[in-house]
Curated annotation (Swiss-Prot):
GO terms for biological process: cell division; chromosome condensation; meiotic cell cycle. It comes from Arabidopsis thaliana. This is Structural maintenance of chromosomes protein 2-1. Keywords: ATP-binding, Cell cycle, Cell division, Coiled coil, DNA condensation, Meiosis, Mitosis, Nucleotide-binding, Nucleus. Residues 2-1161 form the Zinc-hook domain. The lineage of its organism: Eukaryota, Viridiplantae, Streptophyta, Embryophyta, Tracheophyta.
Amino acid sequence: MHIKEICLEGFKSYATRTVVSGFDPHFNAITGLNGSGKSNILDSICFVLGITNLQQVRAANLQELVYKQGQAGITKATVSVTFDNSERHRSPLGYEEHPEITVTRQIVVGGRNKYLINGKLAQPSQVQNLFHSVQLNVNNPHFLIMQGRITKVLNMKPPEILSMLEEAAGTRMYENKKEAALKTLEKKQTKVDEINKLLDHEILPALEKLRKEKSQYMQWANGNAELDRLRRFCIAFEYVQAEKIRDNAVLGVGEMKAKLGKIDAETEKTQEEIQEFEKQIKALTQAKEASMGGEVKTLSEKVDSLAQEMTRESSKLNNKEDTLLGEKENVEKIVHSIEDLKKSVKERAAAVKKSEEGAADLKQRFQELSTTLEECEKEHQGVLAGKSSGDEEKCLEDQLRDAKIAVGTAGTELKQLKTKIEHCEKELKERKSQLMSKLEEAIEVENELGARKNDVEHVKKALESIPYNEGQMEALEKDRGAELEVVQRLEDKVRGLSAQLANFQFTYSDPVRNFDRSKVKGVVAKLIKVKDRSSMTALEVTAGGKLYDVVVDSEDTGKQLLQNGALRRRVTIIPLNKIQSYVVQPRVQQATARLVGKDNAELALSLVGYSDELKNAMEYVFGSTFVCKTTDVAKEVAFNRDIRTPSVTLEGDIFQPSGLLTGGSRKGGGDRLRKLHDLAEAESELQGHQKRLADVESQIKELQPLQMKFTDVYAQLELKTYDLSLFLKRAEQNEHHKLGEAVKKLEEELEEAKSQIKEKELAYKNCFDAVSKLENSIKDHDKNREGRLKDLEKNIKTIKAQMQAASKDLKSHENEKEKLVMEEEAMKQEQSSLESHLTSLETQISTLTSEVDEQRAKVDALQKIHDESLAELKLIHAKMKECDTQISGFVTDQEKCLQKLSDMKLERKKLENEVVRMETDHKDCSVKVDKLVEKHTWIASEKQLFGKGGTDYDFESCDPYVAREKLEKLQSDQSGLEKRVNKKVMAMFEKAEDEYNALISKKNTIENDKSKITKVIEELDEKKKETLKVTWVKVNQDFGSIFSTLLPGTMAKLEPPEDGNFLDGLEVRVAFGKVWKQSLSELSGGQRSLLALSLILALLLFKPAPLYILDEVDAALDLSHTQNIGRMIRAHFPHSQFIVVSLKEGMFNNANVLFRTKFVDGVSTVQRTVTKQTK
């Protein structure tokens, strides 16, 4: 099959319909200037063959294949290729009867792409199958040799060359089919997995469940009969046992009483043996003390002597230590004295200040005395002037005149008041007479007024009976508003802190239904209460990541949470029942307290509060570390030989016994625990306010009905009160009321006048007495004048004396002030002297310390000798113990007798209790037998079978106690089974089993298919290997022949890489003459192009295609090589059609038909020339 004609219309540069006909069946060449459209003819052939990689036809999309991309009015591109199909043995499958085959492909801009085969529409797959059947696969075009492909072949690696060989052999298509088969296998495996998943997750669990339900159903059905049998068996045994105990109780009581008598006799005998042992022990003890006492005494005296000497030396040591201690105490006293002097200096300074203030007070006292003196002198001058006192402005005669005027005025007012009383009494009498005439009207008004007042009082009592005070609800609502505001503020604070501490929130879903959440205690950080806020940084560093651990009651709870708790983050869980905690040993804690002081290093565990149930978890987190106040203390605790325990300072620095130190900047140290502490306080405060808010809400709710009732009654009270006030106003307008008011007013005026008359009479009497007194004073003034003057002069003298004393005190204060200043200076000098003495004492303490150390060494030596002697004394005591062995034997025998006596007493008590028990059992069992016979009527008819072998009541072959346990268990099981048993389980189980068998059958079928496909793939792999080997041999032979034709005097071959076989890849080797080149880099560019072209043509020759297209493959070759290509094509490809694009005459002159392209007026044209006549 070869091309006869190509028709192009609107394709690339061929705008108008252009028919290229007369193709030679063997060798055709196309030439022309660059851009004239020669390669477009090759592109049109590829276009018809169905190419999908448009880069090989130099286009980005199909629209670019249309002339000027549809911009010149041409909107479609059509290419038709006519093939000569006269050779039927080379025809495509299914087209053997067609002498010609015309394949057309058309694309429309923005439209669809269509194919036609012999004028009929065809699918792209049909076109591909047509060309594939004659080795024309345009999407893997080994028949299309472009100049770029030559270069590409030169750069190929061995596996890529092998891939070209596979393509030539046709095994590449097998690989594609193999991949499809493997995908099919994968799909079948997916199906098998789905079946397995269905079996594992649905069918098998359901089948297993139904199998269990079936077993339960059968167990329940069979258990009912067994339950009845066991119940009768146990009742029969209970009856027999009760009869047996009843009958044996009578005999047992007599036997027990006989045993009691025997025990009493044995007890008396044992007591005699105990007394005998006591005598022997006493005799042996006296003999031991007599024989060994002297030696012990000597050694004891030696030990005592050493102890006394050691005491003397220890005394000296204590004296020196006391002296040293005394000197140290003196130092402390001096230090305290210095401190006291400093304090006294401050006190003297304060006293000076106080003295100055006292002087100011004395100055004020002196001023006050001066003022008093002035007043006395003034009064003295007044007496001299004839006044009663110094303050009076008038003399006694003027005062007498004024008093007489006052007597006259008081007498006039008294007369007027008596006249008014007479008038009021007269008018009151008249008004009362008029009032009596209006009495009936007054009684009627009074009755109605009383009724209205009673109504008001009744409503008031009803109001007072309501347990509600006016304004109480408003106060509660005010409290509610205040509490609500506080609660909202605290809730905002809690939310803010909770958001900042989100990592401490542990949220989970219940892992099982009805899960007890109290088993989950919470995060460690939220379970502790820090006792001292200053230790928060140290505690946070001590705990580290354990602060985020979650505490639960057991490992089962932890496992449930991890597996089914839907946890949002990774957590570490501490189960209280399994956690291995470690706490620093008490002796280490005591050693630490002795070394650095109890307050300087504390166990971290003691600094936190927690619930007792959390003890194990808290010991695990905080039990192994000390918290120290300073770095020096922390070092001492960590590195001391007797302690060696991790320690943390308050600033968060860590000291490990291994020598590892961790510290430095710690931004926000303890911040998390502080925030947690603040959060706990806020939550506690929030709960308190929420409780108070709830209480207020509750009170409001309780008071609402009372408030409503109070409001209603209060409204009634206001209404009644208003009604009463209106009535009172009306009553005030009637005649009787007016007369009553007038009488009342007159009575008040009369009463007031009567009370005033007494006052006026008293005032008149006082004025009269004052006149008399003044008259007497004037008479006595001359007599007393001299006395008063003397008294005043005496006072003046006294005040002057006091002023002198105050002046003296003032001077004394000034002197005291100077004295205090001098004392202050003296104290400062004494302080300086004490500081010098302190320095000398510190030197003396250093000397005494050395002497104490020497004396301590001496005491230690004596202690060693004393300890050795004491050890020897103890050895002698040990020997004395051996002497005690015999005594111990007697003591042991005595103790055995005592124990025997105790046992017999206990046995006697048991026997007495047993007698009581048997008598009780006899009575109880008699009642029990009667009740059993009465309750179970079948006992009377089957009683004779109880306990007989071979019957249902054989108590020997079947243990009654085991039967009782079986009965109880069976009753429990049957009760549970009856609730759970599924009555339809038999039919459901059969249906589920059928589904299971069907799926297993389907699965087996699929797995058999998989096995067959795998086997076929293995067989085809072997055939592929054989085919590739044959292909390699044939292509290798043609490769060498073609290359030697193109480049005479050379050889070429394909061989596997070193240390490999041909399936690992093939590489090209070249020889010039008989010398094989080590590398292709030794070849020139033209030689390498010929070598690549030879390989390509050799591959094509293995399975020749009907058509080959070469596009300027001779571009890099000189003229002689180009001519050789033409000759090679004629020699090696006699049955294939070649279409070659070339610009060199050496190439296209060898062609039978030459097509020349030109570019005229923007459109390509083609001219055919026959260069040689085909034979």
